[in-house]
């Protein structure tokens, strides 16, 4: 069972439908016990970083996520959920993140030929093969964001060209992040979610 974390700031239902489509049993929950017992979790997110992090902390889910990461269970952050995995953000004001992947969230450069927010389809360039990227090569995915993950190159597994090379996917051990929306990216998004399903299966096998 995989849990999609519900903290009133994410597109949980569309992610759940995508997981149903690939045959991955899932549940939307904000219950800390259910989340801790899950085989893997997805952290969605839309909106502003400070409010999202505040809500996670208020519910005690920041500690739960860190415990899950320490236990080696897979985590996938989507859009703002990916950004929350990093150490901090300067959106509106400095805010500490979960610190599960090194890096800092910054606003995209405001240049006349590159609109902010970055919205729509953009090509994904694979930098490192992982279970989530092994079946994709140069396809297009769907983005909606104004901030990006400024993190060390070693943790970036895919990028998309814009005013800068945007880290489209990041990874640290069993922790993954997608800046774009896999659940809105058609077949390629489903392939990425299938890759996360494989990570969960592999982790369960190794823990038995």
UniProtKB/Swiss-Prot annotation:
- Primary subcellular site in the record, as a coarse category: cytoplasm
Substrates-to-products reaction catalysed: 5-[(5-phospho-1-deoxy-D-ribulos-1-ylimino)methylamino]-1-(5-phospho-beta-D-ribosyl)imidazole-4-carboxamide + L-glutamine = D-erythro-1-(imidazol-4-yl)glycerol 3-phosphate + 5-amino-1-(5-phospho-beta-D-ribosyl)imidazole-4-carboxamide + L-glutamate + H(+); L-glutamine + H2O = L-glutamate + NH4(+)
Task: Please indicate which superkingdom the organism of origin belongs to.
Answer: Bacteria
Return the Pfam families for the record. Answer: GATase (PF00117)
Q: Which keywords describe this protein according to UniProt?
A: Amino-acid biosynthesis, Cytoplasm, Glutamine amidotransferase, Histidine biosynthesis, Hydrolase, Lyase
A biological process (GO) of this protein is: L-histidine biosynthetic process
Q: What positions constitute the catalytic site?
A: 79, 181, 183
Q: Which GO terms describe its molecular function?
A: glutaminase activity; imidazoleglycerol-phosphate synthase activity; lyase activity
Q: Does the keyword Transferase apply?
A: no
Pathway given in the UniProt record: Amino-acid biosynthesis; L-histidine biosynthesis; L-histidine from 5-phospho-alpha-D-ribose 1-diphosphate: step 5/9
Record bears the keyword Membrane:
no
Query: What Enzyme Commission number does this protein have?
Result: 4.3.2.10, 3.5.1.2
- A GO term from the CC aspect: cytoplasm
Q: Which residues form the Glutamine amidotransferase type-1 domain?
A: 1-206
Q: Where in the cell is it found?
A: Cytoplasm
Summary of the function given for this chain in its UniProt record? IGPS catalyzes the conversion of PRFAR and glutamine to IGP, AICAR and glutamate. The HisH subunit catalyzes the hydrolysis of glutamine to glutamate and ammonia as part of the synthesis of IGP and AICAR. The resulting ammonia molecule is channeled to the active site of HisF.
PANTHER family reported in the protein's UniProt record: IMIDAZOLE GLYCEROL PHOSPHATE SYNTHASE SUBUNIT HISH
Q: Please describe the quaternary structure of this protein.
A: Heterodimer of HisH and HisF.
Protein name, UniProt field = Imidazole glycerol phosphate synthase subunit HisH
Q: Which organism is it from?
A: Listeria monocytogenes serotype 4b (strain CLIP80459)
Q: What is the lineage of its organism?
A: Bacteria, Bacillati, Bacillota, Bacilli, Bacillales
């Amino acid at each position: 069972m995989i849990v999609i974390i519900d903290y009133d700031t994410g597109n949980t239902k569309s992610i759940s439908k995508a997981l149903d489509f690939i045959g991955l049993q899932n549940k939307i929950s904000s219950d800390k016990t259910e989340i801790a017992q899950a085989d893997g979790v997805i952290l969605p997110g839309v909106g502003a970083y400070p409010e999202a992090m505040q809500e996670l902390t208020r519910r005690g889910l920041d500690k739960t996520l860190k415990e899950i990461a320490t236990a080696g269970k897979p985590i996938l952050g989507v859009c703002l959920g990916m950004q929350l995995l990093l150490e901090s953000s300067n959106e509106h004001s400095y805010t500490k993140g979960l610190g599960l992947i090194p890096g800092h969230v910054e606003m995209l450069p405001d240049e006349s030929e590159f609109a902010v927010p970055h919205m729509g389809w953009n090509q994904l360039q694979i930098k490192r093969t992982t279970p989530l990227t092994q079946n994709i090569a140069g396809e297009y995915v769907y983005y909606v964001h104004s901030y990006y993950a400024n993190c060390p190159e070693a943790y970036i597994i895919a990028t998309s060209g814009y005013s800068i090379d945007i880290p489209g996917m990041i990874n640290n051990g069993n922790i993954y992040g997608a800046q774009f929306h896999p659940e809105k990216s058609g077949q390629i998004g489903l392939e990425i979610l299938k890759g996360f399903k494989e990570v969960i299966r592999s982790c369960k096998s190794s823990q038995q």
